[in-house]
Amino acid sequence: MPPLFQALTTALFFCGIASNPLFQPSLVMDMAKVLLDNYCFPENLVGMQETIEQAVKGGEILHISDPDTLANVFTSGVQGYLNDPRLVVSYEPNYSGPQTEQSLELTPEQLKFLINHSVKYDILPGNIGYLRIDFIIGQDVVQKVGPHLVNNIWKKLMPTSALILDLRYSTQGEVSGIPFVVSYLCDSEIHIDSIYNRPSNTTTDLWTLPELMGERYGKVKDVVVLTSKYTKGVAEDASYILKHMNRAIVVGEKTAGGSLDTQKIKIGQSDFYITVPVSRSLSPLTGQSWEVSGVSPCVVVNAKDALDKAQAILAVRSSVTHVLHQLCDILANNYAFSERIPTLLQHLPNLDYSTVISEEDIAAKLNYELQSLTEDPRLVLKSKTDTLVMPGDSIQAENIPEDEAMLQALVNTVFKVSILPGNIGYLRFDQFADVSVIAKLAPFIVNTVWEPITITENLIIDLRYNVGGSSTAVPLLLSYFLDPETKIHLFTLHNRQQNSTDEVYSHPKVLGKPYGSKKGVYVLTSHQTATAAEEFAYLMQSLSRATIIGEITSGNLMHSKVFPFDGTQLSVTVPIINFIDSNGDYWLGGGVVPDAIVLADEALDKAKEIIAFHPSIFPLVKGTGHLLEVHYAIPEVAYKVSSVLQNKWSEGGYRSVVDLESLASLLTSEMQENSGDHRLHVFYSDTEPEILEDQPPKIPSPEELNYIIDALFKIEVLPGNVGYLRFDMMADTEIIKAIGPQLVSLVWNKLVETNSLIIDMRYNTGGYSTAIPIFCSYFFDPEPLQHLYTVYDRSTSTGKDIWTLPEVFGERYGSTKDIYILTSHMTGSAAEVFTRSLKDLNRATLIGEPTSGVSLSVGMYKVGDSNLYVTIPNQVVISSVTGKVWSVSGVEPHVIIQANEAMNIAHRIIKLRTKIPTVIQTAAKLVADNYAFADTGANVASKFIALVDKIDYKMIKSEVELAEKINDDLQSLSKDFHLKAVYIPENSKDRIPGVVPMQIPSPELFEELIKFSFHTDVFEKNIGYIRFDMFADSDLLNQVSDLLVEHVWKKVVDQDALIIDMRFNIGGPTSSIPIFCSYFFDEGTPVLLDKIYSRTSNAMTDIWTLPDLVGKTFGSKKPLIILTSSLTEGAAEEFVYIMKRLGRAYVVGEVTSGGCHPPQTYHVDDTHLYLTIPTSRSASAEPGESWEGKGVLPDLEISSETALLKAKEILESQLEGRR
């Protein structure tokens, strides 16, 4: 029994009253029928009627005497199950039913009165239109009162800048009125809603209207819809549509969650009625409905405050344009990255600001876009101006007293100097002064502050309490920590406001003795360290001159400026200065990140600890380099990297190192970067790592043998007699020798008779390399032995050649059957060497991911007496084919694909390769049977078939590659580039020449096509000129002969001489050549133009001039010149050849391309391969004089660019001579 009626009968049971029975079983059945026929969610009522019948027959429903109680019970039951509060059962013996439409029909005057009292409008401050609608009228009423609404209300709202649509009091309306409300605010013909009506079982789609009375408000101006908890029905639907079309911002309360259409329907013949929603809305915009749940506003406020809130939102939105204008101006005039400004100015105004409802939204939107476009964290837009705590104005020189005692006292106050144990200098000052002040105080500073610390070995500069100040003294202070002999570039400042770029260098001369560039300097920082103090710390770090210790600095630079926006609480911080360090890196704000991050209070102790550690760095760097020189497999690389490491130390590159872990990280990075070998690695370990020494392999017992074989090897014979072998570790050669007979019996013998073999190495991470020759030997013949690779061992400085073995257990797979190896990023070490060996020797096709690039042998060595260890590959593998060291980056497969797709690709390639011999046979037969020159075709076919056993075809991986290979071989054998093989995928078969017929234009298009395709002219001396760049089929030509004569031929036929320009003619069908040639001979005298031999029909065809032509002929007497070029091809060459051979035309230009008669295209078996074969040839020429493949030699060979001028010159001379 469905839960609805379980709930209903249970309620009836507990409310049952034995006396005065009111309930009749038919009442429930009648109610069910009403719901089934009218409820707008019929799918929720499946099985209801049958359940009721069973409940009634079973006596589960008792009698209730009170009708109101019974109505409440029914209401509770249907609402509880269907979760629909709109379903209400009532007992109303005096209900007379709804009035008929006729009784509700109103006069025009009554309609206007109704409209005037249900629609109100106003123009609010800020040119905001206000329209309140309490009843959405239907289509019929709109037709009657529409002009009145437009003229008296809408036209007055149209000039407003924004519109508030107030639906807070709209509780009723007609569905047919929804498109009218929405259409005035949106574009035409947009699908806005779908309404299902249950009584008629129909769905009606609502669209915005294509035409309206009056103008549309448009989709640009802002619209705000006001709602309340009383907004109901049709008004809810309109609100929902406008919200989800992003056309309006909904402000107010969540709506009632009513219905588009509810009806109170009588239940049977009783006095009970049920209110049922008979229609439902399903939005095409969201796929959901607002019914029951209501429309949630974009901005939630009390209904009484909604209008004020809407006006506030519109005020903010109206400011967007003003804010954008100000922002663009500020950026254009101030942003330091001037090259990024055009993109910003173009992008920002075109963003979608439809969701902006507050200044916070404007700030968030614009800030996100600014960050995305510029990637500049300094460029920040905020909704409230945060007051930055900036240092006070720096002391200026004019404010400094002249009294020496007071100057000395000032220096003593500002600077704190002491000498710490270990000859460590300590200097603290809490503000940067202007360089003019430093100049005035310099003698006192040098004597009192600087001279005592110049004799120290290391110096701690305490900036933890330094709030910055003027940065003009920073270059001077930096100069004290550099060598004075060299002018060093410190940084570059680009000031956008001043449009200046300053290169700042160290001072060559300073007062007093410089500290120099070799001693240790340690700068202490805190969150308070700001402006000039940050610049100093940043530059000391970027110049590799100091180790920074403490907290990340404040990020309070003087490179940016805050610009407020007029009339708002918004402001934008714009970097007006770009600070570029000596490495060319831009400092994009943010605090300076210390090399050692500790709490400010702990920074001094940490500095002392690092000072004690730093002397040990160079021995460790040198020791690491020495280990490389001794053990790394490639000596020349080892010496280079060792030198780089030591040079970096001498240049201060290790000052950022603060402990052994950071030293290990930096050494690893430097070694890998400079060697290109990712296997070099330095690491820190408190305890000495266990170094596994080579142990003699344990030979498994017979009991262990089966387990090992099952664990390491997985085999299967796949459909098509394809073997599959997976093994996940390379075992030692001694184990292989010991278990060889069992391995052959249990594994190998099941695979050796397969036609091809897939070896799955995707999960093989390596193992012992000693077994590689054994495994490889199974895939080569016993003789000759194959040189697989050479292993060079640095520890012994010897190379060992690795060869296949003359004898193996069991039968070999041989050297001819295909092998496919599947790889992944996990494939490593010995598995890589096995894989690469077979790839180098073209013995296998590799499919999958590039392998990991793990070394065959890696030694681990301790660096001095420290806790640092370095792993160094001490063997390299040298290719037997190229003689070069194998790359350390791993093996790249022939077919790179994700590892999980490798098996599918392997099957696809296997299937293709099984077809290759048949494809070759088919292609050869097509050439032999159809090639225009029979002897050549037979010779090419014979040689082509012999190529099938070549390695090139055995390594084909795709039909594309096969097509390219066949094409190259056929053209190489035939010396005919018109004999082609192409790959044409399924989705491109509409482009197959000679297979898919060309689309013939409609007759209506022919006239324009002819005018476009033919170019005619008449030069001086009555010389005609005609050019066309392609020959048409004779059938097509016959269809348009009248048009050709009218629009082309008549313009040149009566001239005294004619130039036919074939320089750009690429050929086409040859069937129209007799027609064209006939116009240049005399009528009534047939002329044999050519003999054409067709190989497909093995017949010779004589080509004659035609007796009947449309229009008059040019005749055989008037001079005719044909222009040619190296582009002239195919049918154009045949025409030129005929006219020259018969002496009818004089040919001027270049030798033609040497094409052929139009070839035929043949499909090769069930592949996507097609052969294009020349099947016809001209047979009139003497042997060896045909134009096919050689071209037509002109009578006058000159450049095609000058051919026309030369032709005109020749014809003018001839015509002049005749006169």
Curated annotation (Swiss-Prot):
Q: Which UniProt keywords apply?
A: Cytoplasm, Extracellular matrix, Glycoprotein, Receptor, Repeat, Secreted, Signal
GO-annotated cellular components: cone matrix sheath; cytoplasm; extracellular region
Location of the protein in the cell: Secreted, Extracellular space, Extracellular matrix, Interphotoreceptor matrix; Cytoplasm
Entry annotated with the keyword Acetylation: no
Which tissues carry this protein? Expressed in retina; at similar levels by both cones and rods. Weakly expressed in brain. In embryos, expression is restricted to the central retina.
Entry-linked SUPFAM superfamilies? ClpP/crotonase
Q: Which residue ranges contain the repeat sequence?
A: 127-301, 423-598, 721-897, 1022-1198
Posttranslational modification: Glycosylated.
Annotated family: Belongs to the peptidase S41A family.
Protein source organism: Xenopus laevis (African clawed frog)
What is the protein name for this chain? Retinol-binding protein 3
Family annotation (InterPro entries): ClpP/crotonase-like_dom_sf, Tail-specific_protease
UniProt signal peptide: 1-22
Subunit (UniProt)? Monomer. Interacts with retinol. Predominantly found as a monomer, but to a really lower extent also found as a homodimer.
Where mainly found?
Answer: secreted
